[in-house]
């Protein structure tokens, strides 16, 4: 199975990415994770993207807050799918990161999830990999069924409480 390559602009994004890594691990998806900044370590970020395919990566997740140019910088250097994960920073409640991540020029796409949407970034990466992996597709279907069952269990508990 191809790996998911995860890169964050700062270790301050790590709490969000722990959810990403936990979700990938729960689906038995291999991954690697790095801290590379689009602004402070641009050569390392570029090299990571340029070498991702030959290093066994099938999809990339790039997380950053504030100016959040990392996903675009990664996407500019690979034709692998890139998922942008905007993270909340000290101002604007993450809107600056969201807009910086989602507003890409034509020809350099970045699929973008919600601000701090680490779980959905992992699930989107899994869905991309599952296009060519029936076993992974089955795991995703089982997860969806389990999630639905959990919601229905909560509804049943609520209905029982309301009908006392």
Language-model features: where?
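Glycine/small-residue-rich loop that forms an oxyanion/phosphate-binding "nest" at active or ligand-binding sites
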Residues: 77-102, 106
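N-terminal beta-loop-helix "entrance" segment that forms/cooperates
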Residues: 33-54
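Glycine/charged-rich beta-loop-alpha catalytic/anionic-binding loops adjacent to active sites
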Residues: 2, 29-32, 79-80, 102-110
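C-terminal binding/interaction regions
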Residues: 8-15, 19-20, 95-164
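Acidic, glycine/proline-rich low-complexity segments that act as flexible tails and inter-domain linkers
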Residues: 33, 43, 66, 158-164
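Glycine-rich phosphate-binding loop
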Residues: 48-86
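Glycine-rich phosphate/diphosphate-binding loop of Rossmann-like nucleotide-binding domains
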Residues: 2-40
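Short glycine/serine/threonine-rich phosphate/pyrophosphate-binding segments
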Residues: 13-17, 41-45, 64-73, 92-95, ...
């Amino acid at each position: 199975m191809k790996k998911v390559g995860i890169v964050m602009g700062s270790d301050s994004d790590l709490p969000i990415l722990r959810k990403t890594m936990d979700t990938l691990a729960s689906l038995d998806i291999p991954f690697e994770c790095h801290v590379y900044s689009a602004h402070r370590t641009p050569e390392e970020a570029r090299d990571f993207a340029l070498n991702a395919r030959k290093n066994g990566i099938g999809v990339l997740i790039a997380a950053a807050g504030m100016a959040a140019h990392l996903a675009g910088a990664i996407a500019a250097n690979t034709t692998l799918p890139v998922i942008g994960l905007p993270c909340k920073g000290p101002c604007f409640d993450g809107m600056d990161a969201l807009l910086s991540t989602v507003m890409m020029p034509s020809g350099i796409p970045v699929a973008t999830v919600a601000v701090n949407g680490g779980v959905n970034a992992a699930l989107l990466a899994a869905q991309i990999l599952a296009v060519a992996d029936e076993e992974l597709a089955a795991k995703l279907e089982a997860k969806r069924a389990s999630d639905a069952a959990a919601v229905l269990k909560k509804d049943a508990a609520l209905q029982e409480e309301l009908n006392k």
